[in-house]
Amino acid sequence: MKSDPELYDYLPYRNRPKITWPNGARVAFWVAPNIEFYELEPPGNPQRTPWGRPNPDVLAYSWRDYGNRAGFWRMMEAMERYGVRGSVSLNVAVCEHHPEVIAECVKRDWEFYSHGIYNTRYTYGMSEAQERALIEDAFATVQKHTGQRLAGWLSPALTNTERTLD
């Protein structure tokens, strides 16, 4: 891989044009909740272990499972209270494991982009064909469960490859 992938030109902060937001707003923010699913005993990957402790890591799994059982619902209620729409970074396994979560996002017209199938299955070491199949499967799963056609991809656990740097 090249030391600089040349995805964008260098532009120092002081040389950038001034950004103006609609209605004269001084601040803009984007709320992109990661709605993820971690397997208790994921398949191995020689490049990275999914858990910091031996498998099954019940402690780490339960911390992460809290998000779908309690954290998501609390976050959604707070966002709704303040009129904030989400852009969901989604492990698409949530569509099968917790369809109620997906239904609530759809009901609120949140936008989805794929964050892989499971957050414990990495793209490191995949061939281009394997990675393409993973992405196509994720996009098809989200469209089936939400009706949305995806335009974005964020590799699971940020395990980008040379093909998915941006």
Predicted features and spans:
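Catalytic alpha-helical scaffold of carbohydrate-active enzymes acting on polysaccharides/glycoconjugates
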Residues: 1-152, 157-166
